[in-house]
């Protein structure tokens, strides 16, 4: 799928070269109650720097992926891993999310995102909001989709990108041609 999605390599390298903290997805079996969560969940784990990023092996889609044997050596944004680290007091500033398609809802003013169907990002955002939502001074995470311009549908034929009650609307979407589409509705505090 690398040729069918926006590549994040330059974004990751630039952020790391500027000294930013960069977290990438790590999928794993969950220890959470199976009645309240999927069998596998996504956490965000920190990259240690450019050399660490370059050492990551690529998965079957060509995406650099964390070796499960190194997860306990890494900071996890939600904490609570096997190493028992606490979450950051501040949390994440921005999350870039993939999607199959995006559009604009004329009624609500939201950008709608059609994910890949597993709910990994939506469930992570829900867990993140529970962990950070009541922290004093916490600024809600900005959620932006990342897409090719062809993935942003203008007046889709069937009228709408399908979304469910658990789908988190992004604040906007950044397109491969440099265009940024913003939601105009106030998204509830996460």
Language-model regions: role of each:
Residues 1-87:
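N-terminal active-site beta-alpha-beta segment that forms phosphate/nucleotide-binding
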Residues 50, 62-95, 99-116, 122-190:
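Surface-exposed, charge/polar-rich loops and edge strands
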């Amino acid at each position: 799928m690398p040729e069918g999605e926006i590549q994040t390599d330059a974004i990751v390298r630039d952020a790391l070269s500027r000294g930013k903290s960069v977290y990438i997805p790590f999928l794993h079996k969950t220890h959470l109650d199976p009645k309240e969560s999927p069998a596998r969940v996504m956490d965000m784990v920190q990259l240690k720097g450019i050399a660490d990023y370059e050492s990551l092996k690529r998965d079957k889609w060509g995406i650099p992926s964390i070796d499960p044997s190194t997860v306990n050596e890494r900071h996890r944004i939600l904490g609570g891993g096997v190493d028992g680290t606490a979450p950051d007091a501040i949390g994440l500033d921005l999350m870039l999310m993939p999607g199959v398609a995006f559009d604009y809802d004329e009624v609500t003013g939201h950008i709608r995102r059609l994910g890949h169907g597993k709910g990994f990002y939506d469930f992570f955002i829900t867990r993140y909001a529970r962990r950070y939502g009541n922290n004093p001074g916490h600024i809600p995470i900005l959620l932006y989709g990342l897409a090719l311009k062809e993935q942003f549908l203008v007046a889709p034929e069937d009228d709408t990108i399908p979304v469910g009650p658990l789908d988190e609307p992004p604040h906007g979407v950044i397109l491969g041609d440099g265009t940024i589409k913003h939601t105009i509705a106030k998204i509830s505090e996460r």
